[in-house]
């Protein structure tokens, strides 16, 4: 095992670029759905499935992906990066919807392996006091990928130039996967340690109250963010806000979130202020959604959504850092559980808003109500200082689960 220094940052940077690539390829067609429909000769609703298959497959594949990361970490992550890049290239196979869907399916299968590894990559390649920063960088990479998709779509894919957009994104995906492959040649700090994880790890983790708290917060936070990203343009249209202006609001939210991810999570971890921050994030989400429904001026709404992005998006790396502390050798499975809960939240809250989409104020208030469900959860959020006891209990439970399985095999 090599010494714990800062030499793992190239791996973190390469991994963040692959996280960005998965999000970029996921949202390729969302900003240019009408042009994509004309390009492939299908309906706009059919184009929507090119993005909607991602959360659906994530819910199915999350736990197997997490177990794979815990037992075969580097090979699994390499395969995830390679499959992401292959999906981007596969979309260039022909000007048919089938080729587009084939590429998206490949990326959708890779996504659970890639993003579920955020905690484990930081745990394997960074010392303890740098892990919160590492998870924040990877999370910022994911949000940067979303931002890049929102920018490149209208810039390169306008006026039916879909192939040009796909070529550029395929190149970016291949470069990111190549960088990850190069940096993963060197094993991490814990590369020679076998994870004490077996089939019962999910049940063991779920038995921990803190794990259920973290999953609940992911469900709420992801749910509201995905619903906003999906329906904001439609909800603001009755107020006379154009599709382009609504797109700018989303970009502002993500930009503010990336800035928050760069600064807040490591600072909060050092000060043990995660619980206070999560309370603020939940309340910001609730009051922000209500304000978006109540305000009529575009400038006021822009200010609200920027503040929401600045506070809400950094909550993801804060949750993932707490999950990594809790899970011990089962970081992959635990991370997959968090992301699965988040994707479930995205599906559920987006469907709730879809029912209310023709009543914008009711839709925004529904998202505010969902946000308030996180208030009691945030009150139980584990800080770095308060979680030590349960981390020890969780590690012992996981080790005991693995020992029990081994005993049954003898």
Residue ranges with predicted function:
Residues 29-30, 210-251, 257-258:
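Extracytoplasmic gate region of multi-pass secondary transporters
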Residues 61-73, 260-273:
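Helix-to-loop junctions at the C-terminal end of transmembrane segments
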Residues 137-185:
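Helix-loop-helix hairpin linking two adjacent transmembrane segments in secondary transporters
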